[in-house]
């Protein structure tokens, strides 16, 4: 049985009030010369595009391996800070299915998709987190910001960007969470997907949330409202009693099984892998429904 990862409050993080470059190096498992080497900023990145299955392409800003390794270690340090109940990615033990399941049974579900979240998260926000929230020295906050950003924003290919996208707006999410708690709403955040649900969710309150986003320099480009009908949250259908895969997921599985029967060689192996992946996703949804049915201890 997997063990639960230990977390600690923010003010008990080894990064909290960090003022020594030597201690930073020890935390990241590198030497001071290696720290200088990975602090060269934009020169350590390569940009390219990869095609999306849905069409179009995704632009990737990929850090060189030594920098990426340091970013991954820093991400683990930040992920060890106890997350709020509403944060679902990147949090160990939480996923897109459990994110959707939080909204089961609510009559109204409202979803906002933040536009270009990583490119629109500026370095000044990242510096603010390291300096004002973690309380690092100004010098180290600047150094950490250099390690974390590319061309003045969070890079799309960095393993550090998902957790920093949350922490860079630590104050914003705190205010949004306080508003939702005061109104009895359910709030979840899954990277750039913000979902609020309840028996009723007023337009006025959603406007207040949007105002918080706009004041922070963020914009949404998709808004979905579901009232007294199944909602789709992070690719999962949310109903009154449980979660389910969308019909397109079942169609993909049907097509993949057909390909297994029809194809040969490497193409068949690829189809088998596709079937296994889709079955795993459906099983994850089934497990989540079993948790929902389990009586609270």
Would you name each region that the model predicts?
Residues 1-51, 55-112, 117-158, 167-178, ...:
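Right-hand nucleic-acid polymerase module
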Residues 84, 180-187:
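Surface-exposed helix-capping loop/turn segments at secondary-structure junctions
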Residues 186-190, 222-224:
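Short beta-strand
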């Amino acid at each position: 049985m997997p063990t639960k990862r230990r977390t600690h409050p923010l003010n008990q993080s080894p990064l909290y009030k960090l003022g020594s470059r030597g201690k930073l190096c020890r935390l990241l498992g590198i030497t001071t010369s290696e720290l200088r080497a990975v602090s060269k900023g934009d020169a350590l990145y390569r940009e390219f595009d990869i095609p999306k299955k849905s069409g179009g392409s995704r632009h990737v800003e990929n850090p060189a391996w030594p920098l990426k390794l340091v970013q991954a270690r820093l991400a683990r340090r930040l992920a060890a800070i106890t997350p709020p109940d509403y944060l679902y990615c990147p949090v160990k033990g939480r996923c897109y299915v459990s994110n959707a399941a939080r909204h089961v049974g609510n009559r109204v579900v409202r979803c906002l998709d933040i536009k270009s979240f990583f490119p629109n998260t500026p370095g000044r926000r990242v510096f603010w987190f390291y300096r004002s929230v973690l309380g690092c020295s100004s010098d180290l906050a600047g150094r950490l910001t250099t390690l974390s950003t590319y061309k003045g924003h969070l890079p799309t290919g960095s393993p550090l960007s998902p957790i920093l996208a949350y922490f860079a707006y630590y104050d914003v999410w705190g205010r949004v969470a306080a508003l939702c708690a005061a109104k009895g709403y359910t709030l979840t955040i899954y990277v750039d997907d913000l979902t609020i649900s309840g028996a009723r969710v007023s337009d006025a309150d959603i406007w207040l949330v949007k105002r918080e986003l706009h004041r922070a320099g963020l914009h949404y480009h998709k808004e979905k409202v579901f009232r007294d009908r199944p909602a789709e949250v992070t690719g999962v259908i949310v109903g009154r009693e449980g979660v389910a895969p969308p019909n397109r997921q079942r169609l993909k599985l049907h097509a993949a099984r057909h390909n297994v029967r029809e194809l040969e060689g490497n193409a068949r192996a690829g189809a088998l892998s596709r079937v296994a992946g889709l079955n795993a996703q459906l099983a994850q949804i089934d497990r989540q429904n079993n948790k929902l049915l389990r009586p609270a201890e």
